[in-house]
Curated annotation (Swiss-Prot):
This is Propionyl-CoA carboxylase beta chain. Its EC number is 6.4.1.3. Residues 292-540 form the CoA carboxyltransferase C-terminal domain. It comes from Saccharopolyspora erythraea (strain ATCC 11635 / DSM 40517 / JCM 4748 / NBRC 13426 / NCIMB 8594 / NRRL 2338). The gene is pccB. Disruption phenotype: Mutant lacks PCCase activity. Mutation has no effect on erythromycin production.
């Protein structure tokens, strides 16, 4: 085991005599040194000037000190086209191998922009394919560090073939081992499809770019003027497209996020997530374990159902130490997704955010949550759902862009999930959105509600206008105060149906609890569900509405 930036052995000052044992060893050290320093000093200096590290420096940042074991260090390309045979650096522009992160094994590849611009050729691709196969065989996560100009044009279709080999392995590994992509520079053309298939993509502000076709091609074909940053920058993919899951301020931040993310995940779909020492909920009455932070939940939900509150305040009071690692925080902010721990064990959190679009479900929020729920289900991570949803976002834009089909993805994700599912309704749960957000009817195991919950077909205002349309019209004809009557009828509807007790009477809610008792109830539910076993009907695969 070694550092990625330190070659094994000291290179000889002069050409060694390879006819002796000592000379052969010296020759090995020379080759190792050339492999580690494959990029020219000028290329490395340019990389550093952009605020970017080299491929090997990034591996050293990611892995535990001294844990890196390199593969194919001496591999070189075989191309003779366009004078390529005159320049055959060791490693061929990508560093591959394995090591540990916090003592847990991971496989890694890191593209080297200082060698051929990180372009992918046949040997380059074969090295990535080999380490992907190793990750699958050994059941460990794969971290890919991308910094590449794209396919190596000089090698022609061989490069394209290796891209497809990589895509195929990304697909086969999906749901088997966690796959994380770090975009540390350009990632263009067909190369973008590998990160797209992986589970999480992290980009660095101002230095990362992903796009199928670049600004110049777009200008030529469509006449549009767009910058690299606006077209495919880190902020664009975090805020607008949703292709990235974290916007890092720099490379240190990006790698720190990946290391923290790995701490919540199992090594593969047959193992369990790491369990850390956490604040355990004591046996006995749930009320006995209520602390000051828990009591703050009792006053969190405003009296007015139309006044927002921050759902993050709920999440941080339920998870250990208030630590919540959010995923896709800048995309579809009306839906919160991320990881926390309860009693030291990982849990995925899905929550409506009343501070954004009143917590409504739209296309982006539905797809964001659906992907997250499916990831948690694939890797046996329980899902905690916090519900405050007034419905689906209305509008022609949503309807014409496929909210029916795309919103159904979230329903599908919950219905096919077999991991422990615990749902807490904090306030609104209206109409079809109630069904979609981890309802008992879709298979949730434990459904809890706060006394502030309003579980109904629709809100009081809309319901009163429909139920009492004739009565309101007659009052208007008589010259009575229609608004006062409407307010009274709305209150009557709220008192009758907008509460958690109608659902509780039917068993759709297992218990109505004080907000301050939520952590205790959730912890006990997850403890009880730890050995849950559930099987779906036999099938090749379902047909999710893509």
């Amino acid at each position: 085991m070694s550092s990625a930036t330190e070659p094994v052995g000291v290179p000889p000052a002069e050409a060694p005599d390879i006819h002796t044992t000592a000379g052969k060893l010296a020759d090995l050290y020379r080759r190792n040194h050339e492999a580690v320093h494959a990029g020219s000093e000028r290329a490395v200096a340019k990389q550093h000037a952009k605020g970017k590290r080299t491929a090997r420096e990034r591996i050293d940042m990611l892995l535990d000190e001294g844990s890196f074991v390199e593969l194919d260090e001496h591999a070189r390309h075989r191309s003779t086209n366009f004078g390529m045979d005159a320049d055959r650096p060791y490693g061929d522009g990508v560093v591959t191998g394995w090591g540990t992160v916090d003592g847990r094994r991971v496989c890694v590849f890191s593209q080297d922009f200082t060698v051929f611009g990180g372009s992918l050729g046949e040997v380059f691709g074969e090295k990535i394919v080999k380490v992907m196969d190793l990750a699958m065989k050994t059941g460990c996560p794969l971290v890919g560090i991308n910094d590449s100009g794209g396919a190596r044009i000089q090698e022609g279709v061989a490069a394209l073939g290796l891209y497809a080999e990589i895509f195929k392995r990304n697909t086969h590994a999906s749901g088997v081992i966690p796959q994380i992509s770090l975009i540390m520079g350009p990632c263009a053309g067909g190369a973008v499809y590998s990160p797209a298939i992986t589970d999480f993509t992290v980009m660095v502000d101002q230095t990362s770019h992903m796009f199928i076709t670049g600004p110049d091609v777009i200008k030529t074909v469509t006449g549009e003027d767009v910058s690299f940053e606006d077209l495919g920058g880190a902020r664009t993919h975090n805020e607008r497209s949703g292709n990235a899951h974290y916007l890092a301020t720099d490379e240190d931040d990006a790698i720190s996020y990946v290391k923290e993310l790995l701490s919540f995940l199992p090594s593969n779909n047959l193992s369990s997530s790491p369990v850390f020492p956490g604040a355990e909920v004591e046996e006995g009455s749930v009320a006995d374990g209520v602390g000051d932070a828990d009591l703050e939940l009792d006053a969190l939900v405003p009296d007015s159902p139309n006044q927002p509150y921050d759902m993050r305040e709920v999440i941080t009071r339920l998870v250990d130490e208030g630590e919540f690692l959010e995923v896709s925080a800048l995309f579809a902010p009306n839906m919160l997704c991320g990881f926390g721990r309860i009693e030291g064990a990982s849990v995925g959190v899905v929550a409506n955010q009343p501070m954004q679009l009143a917590g409504t479900l739209d296309i982006d929020a539905s797809e964001k949550a659906a992907r997250f729920v499916r990831f948690c289900d694939a890797f046996n991570i329980p899902v905690l759902t916090l519900v405050d949803v007034p419905g689906f976002l209305p509008g022609t834009g949503q309807e014409w862009n496929g909210i029916i089909r795309r919103g159904a993805k979230l329903l599908y994700a919950y219905a096919e999930a077999t991991v422990p599912l615990v749902t807490v309704i904090t306030r609104k749960a209206y109409g079809g959105a109630y069904d979609v957000m981890g309802s008992k009817h879709l298979g949730a195991d434990i459904n809890l509600a706060w006394p502030t919950a309003q579980i109904a077909v629709m809100g009081a205002q809309g319901a009163a206008n429909i139920l009492y349309r004739r009565q309101l019209a007659e009052a208007a004809e008589r010259g009575e105060d229609v608004e006062a009557l409407r307010a009274r009828l709305q209150q009557e509807y709220e008192d009758t149906l907008c509460n958690p007790y109608v659902a509780a009477e039917r068993g759709y809610v297992d218990s109505v609890i004080p907000p301050s008792h939520t952590r205790g109830h959730v912890a006990r539910a997850l403890r009880m569900l730890a050995d849950k076993r559930e099987a779906l009907p036999a099938k090749k695969h379902g047909n999710i509405p893509l």
